[in-house]
Amino acid sequence: MGQPLPPVALLLLVSASSRAADVPKALVLLDPPWASVLKDDHVTLKCQGLHPAGDNTTQWLHNGSLLSSQAPAYTITAARAEDGGEYRCQTGLSSLSDPVQLHVHLGWLVLQAPRWVFQEGEPIQLRCHSWKNNKLHKVTYLQNGRGLRYFHQNSDLHIPEATRNHSGSYFCRGLIGHHNMSSETVTITVQGPANPVISSSVLPWHQIAFCLVMGLLLAADTGLYFSVQRDLRSSQRARKEHTLGWSLGSQDK
């Protein structure tokens, strides 16, 4: 029967298992960063995650189905309606990413943003994008049906710090040639305030609990180890004294 692991070895083994279970998630990034695009737009999805040395294999999922591409970047050269949906990725040393939604619209204009939910204090960037980048001018951004900003030449709308007042429905309109075009309406939500960021130096509660339990186990095992060692030494010392006494008694006879 094999000997039980010493306390320190047991602690290291369990700690290594805990780290192996805590695999970082991969991350899907859009390039350009817009969550909504028009038909025929060019879009690249990039997967950020850890790879084994010399192996950049990446698994891509579209609406839950595995894609044939295994490259770190997945390119859509001319977007179609069926390219819209949910994308996720995974690398050799990263777990499956959270889903990223890509919306493909049919029309002349689309109002673009990196996402539709923001925290108070975050910047918001909106873009009025035309199909095949047709020249667009006299552009108006509207919030809840009211004009928010006008540009004679098409420009992005920047909101430096989002507040609750920036929540609402948005669309843009402008001229392509002599034709007045409008985008579909989208909803932007501003939440907040954002939860305070916990310093990475502070361990999550489950890791703290794990360390406390392992510390107690280590202390108990260490105490038991030294107690057994002390008893063994005492027993050996008593046995030596008994043997020595018996030997001296024999000589006296």
UniProtKB/Swiss-Prot annotation:
Q: Where is the signal peptide?
A: 1-20
Which cysteine pairs are covalently linked by disulfides here?
Answer: 47-89, 128-172
Membrane-traversing stretches: 208-226
Membrane topology is: Single-pass membrane protein
The chain's Extracellular topological domains, given as residue ranges, are 21-207
Which terms in the GO cellular component ontology are assigned? external side of plasma membrane
Q: Where is this site: Important for receptor turnover?
A: 221
Keywords linked to the UniProt accession: Cell membrane, Disulfide bond, Glycoprotein, IgG-binding protein, Immunoglobulin domain, Membrane, Receptor, Repeat, Signal, Transmembrane, Transmembrane helix
Q: Which residues are glycosylated?
A: 56, 63, 165, 180
Q: Which domain of life is it from?
A: Eukaryota
Location of the protein in the cell: Cell membrane
Keyword set includes Signal:
yes
Question: Which GO terms are recorded in the biological process aspect for this UniProt protein?
Answer: antibody-dependent cellular cytotoxicity
Domain Ig-like C2-type, chain residue ranges per copy: 24-90, 99-189
Checking InterPro entries in the record gives: Ig-like_dom, Ig-like_dom_sf, Ig-like_fold, Ig_Fc_receptor, Ig_sub, Ig_sub2
GO terms, molecular function: IgG binding; IgG receptor activity
State where it is primarily located.
membrane
The record's section on CDD domains has: Ig1_FcgammaR_like, Ig2_FcgammaR_like
**Residues on the Cytoplasmic side?**
227-253
Task: Summarize subunit and interaction data from the UniProt record for this chain.
Answer: Forms a heterooligomeric complex with ITAM-containing signaling subunits FCER1G. Interacts (via transmembrane domain) with signaling subunits; this interaction is a prerequisite for receptor complex expression on the cell surface and intracellular signal transduction. Binds the Fc region of antigen-complexed IgG.
Q: What does this protein do?
A: Receptor for the invariable Fc fragment of immunoglobulin gamma (IgG). Optimally activated upon binding of clustered antigen-IgG complexes displayed on cell surfaces, triggers lysis of antibody-coated cells, a process known as antibody-dependent cellular cytotoxicity (ADCC). Does not bind free monomeric IgG, thus avoiding inappropriate effector cell activation in the absence of antigenic trigger. Mediates IgG effector functions on natural killer (NK) cells.
Per its UniProt record, what PANTHER family does this chain match?
IMMUNOGLOBULIN FC RECEPTOR (PTHR11481), LOW AFFINITY IMMUNOGLOBULIN GAMMA FC REGION RECEPTOR III-A-RELATED (PTHR11481:SF103)
Protein name per Swiss-Prot or TrEMBL: Low affinity immunoglobulin gamma Fc region receptor III-A
Q: What is the lineage of its organism?
A: Eukaryota, Metazoa, Chordata, Craniata, Vertebrata
